[in-house]
Amino acid sequence: MNKVLIIAAHPDDEILGCGGLLSNLRDQAEFKVVFVAEGTTCRYDKPSCQEAQKEIELRNGFAVKALNSLGVTHYCFYNLPCGRLDNTPQIEINKIIEKEIKLFSPDTVFTHSNCDSNKDHHKVYDATIIATRPQSLVKRVLSYEVLSSTEWGFDKAFSPNVFYPLTEKNVQDKWDALEFYETEIKEFPYPRSEKGIKTLASYRGLQSGHENAEAYKLIRGTL
C-alpha cells in the first residue's frame, strides 16, 4: 500500500475502522480521508438550524485534530445530511467517490462494510463498489468495522478475512485520536470507550495470532 484512500460516512468512522493502520503506516504510505456526510444533524428535528450547523463545524474540527495526531493531512468534507443518505440519489454519492479517486489516484481503498446496521454506511459501501470498478486504478478494496454499528448487524455478520497486526502503541494512538471526538465516546461498557477499543483490538489479535489487530474484509483485489 502506497496511496490509501479511506472513505467514511461520518467523522469518527475513519478512526474506529482504520486508526491503528493509520498509526502503523504513517511513515510508509500516503493517506487521504473522504467524509461523505456530517455526523450530527440526525440528532436534530431541523438539520438546518444554527445549532446543528455549529455542531457540524465542531465535529469536523474534531476530525482534523484526530487525523493530524496520526500524521494525516489530506482530508475533505462533503457534509451530506447525516442519517439521510437514503434520501440522497445514489449517483451523487458515487460521483463524490469517483471524483476523489481520480484526484488522489489511490492503489488501496478502505470503505464501510455492507453488514453495518447504519444505513448511511450501506450507501457509502454501494457507492465505493461502483466507483472502484475493476477497470479503475484501484488495486484493492477493503471494508472495515465500526464499533456501535458493525457488531449490531445481526442478520449479516461481518466476516473479516484480513487482519492487520498492531503494536500496543498503535492501539493507544488509535484511542488517543478517538478521544478528540469528545461527544462520541463514553465509559465502558459503551463500545466507543478506551476499554472497548482495546478489547476489540485484542480480540482481533486473538483471532489472527497477534497481540492486537484490526480486522478488514477484502472485497476485491490482492494484498
Show which residues each predicted segment covers.
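A short, flexible beta-alpha/helix-coil linker loop
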Residues: 39-41, 80-83
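Glycine-rich phosphate-binding loop and adjoining beta1-alpha1-beta2 segment
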Residues: 41, 46-70, 74-75
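Short, conserved clusters of charged catalytic residues that mark active-site
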Residues: 16-17, 58, 92
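Metal-dependent de-N-acetylase/amidase catalytic core
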Residues: 1-7, 24-28, 53-54, 68, ...
